[in-house]
Swiss-Prot record:
Residues 25-227 are mitochondrial intermembrane. PROSITE patterns: ZF_RING_2. SMART domains: RING (SM00184). This is Mitochondrial E3 ubiquitin protein ligase 1. The lineage of its organism: Eukaryota, Metazoa, Ecdysozoa, Arthropoda, Hexapoda. Residues 1-3, 249-338 are cytoplasmic. GO terms for biological process: positive regulation of mitochondrial fission; protein ubiquitination. GO terms for cellular component: mitochondrial outer membrane; peroxisome.
């Protein structure tokens, strides 16, 4: 308990340090695979390029093209004039909650999310690459086509109940995001030739990206994020080093104090034994000597057996059973032998 606050602070800092290190590794690896990923044009030569690869796959590649639905495009449920290939509708609750300190803070809570997706491809004139599992993309650039906030009409009872419960609803927000038909995107993932169809899908080499940014812009984003994470690592490492040094200093002082106290106790015990030796009679019979060390006189009575058989030094070391009768020792007391 002596180092509780320092230990908790160090544990939290190490946890944050671990999360930052994990982020750094992720950003570094993603930037590395992005730099190594080849970029191809969607044209008539792309199929032959993929076909020459092992298993007819390019593990991580970059393509750019126009979003084109395979079939009838989806219509926005909230804005019918908008069509696309992917639709995400979210319902958020806006509320204020009372924290431990008594302050009210605003929070957003996702109540419902639904997504619709249809087959689509990235095309360049008459050539295209089908996109598989677009919703799993690490970066998915979509357009917000609908955003509506409806404040709550709270009654007096709702206000009173919210005050005592610590949660008060402020309103509901509905948003709809659509990947529009005709959008120009950069897709990064595994490029595979399945029969006569080219497909872009999630890869084991790196995350799937469907973004309006270029490859170089994505790399710059991850490099900037990596630099920021390095600064976080430096700060967290410095704090950890300071906390470890502070705890080590306190431990050193504690151990030093304990050693000094032990030396004082040992010196006092030695002086006490010397005083006892000077004050006791020089000639003692065998019956008057401690049954353990046979040097000091009997000074302690063991209870409940009542045997007077130990000196004070040996009594400090024996606390379980009586050395004479092997009975359990409940307590000890000084014995005065005339």
């Amino acid at each position: 308990m002596e180092f509780l606050h320092e230990s908790v602070a160090l544990g939290v800092d190490l946890l944050i340090l671990g999360l930052c290190a994990r982020e750094y590794v992720h950003y570094k690896r993603t930037a590395k695979v992005l730099k190594a990923a080849p970029q191809y044009n969607i044209d008539g030569d792309l199929k032959s390029v993929v076909e020459r690869q092992r298993d007819k796959k390019i593990p991580y590649a970059v393509i750019r093209g126009t979003v084109t639905p395979i079939g009838v495009p989806l219509r926005s449920s909230l804005v019918p004039s908008v069509s696309g290939v992917l639709q995400i509708v979210k319902l958020h609750e806006h509320r204020v909650t009372r924290g431990f300190a008594g302050f009210w803070t605003e929070q957003h809570k996702l109540l419902h999310e639904s997504a619709n997706e249809m087959p689509f491809e990235l095309r360049n004139q008459s050539h295209g690459v089908e996109i598989v599992d677009a919703l799993s993309a690490a970066v998915l650039d979509v357009d917000v086509v609908y955003d509506n906030y409806e404040p709550s009409n709270l009654s007096l009872f709702d206000h009173v109940f919210g005050f005592f419960s610590g949660v008060r609803q402020r309103g509901l927000q509905t948003t709809e995001e659509v990947l529009r038909e005709g959008s120009f995107l950069t897709a990064i993932g595994e490029l595979e030739l399945d029969g006569d169809t080219l497909r872009m899908q999630p890869s084991n080499e790196g995350p799937l990206f469907l973004t309006t940014a270029t490859k170089s812009t994505l790399i710059k984003r991850f490099e900037d994020a990596k630099t920021t994470t390095i600064l976080k690592l430096v700060v967290c490492s410095t704090i950890s080093a300071i906390l470890v040094a502070f705890i080590a200093k306190k431990l050193y002082r504690k151990r030093k104090q304990e050693r000094e106290e032990a030396k004082i106790r040992e010196r006092l015990d030695t002086e006490r034994r010397e005083r006892r030796a000077r004050s006791r009679p020089h000639t003692l019979s065998q019956d008057q000597l401690c049954v353990v060390c046979s040097t000091n006189p009997k000074e302690i009575i063991l209870l409940p057996c009542g045997h007077v058989c130990l000196c004070e030094d040996c009594a400090q070391k024996i606390s379980v059973t009586c050395p004479v009768c092997r009975g359990s020792i409940v307590s000890k007391a000084a014995a005065f032998i005339a």
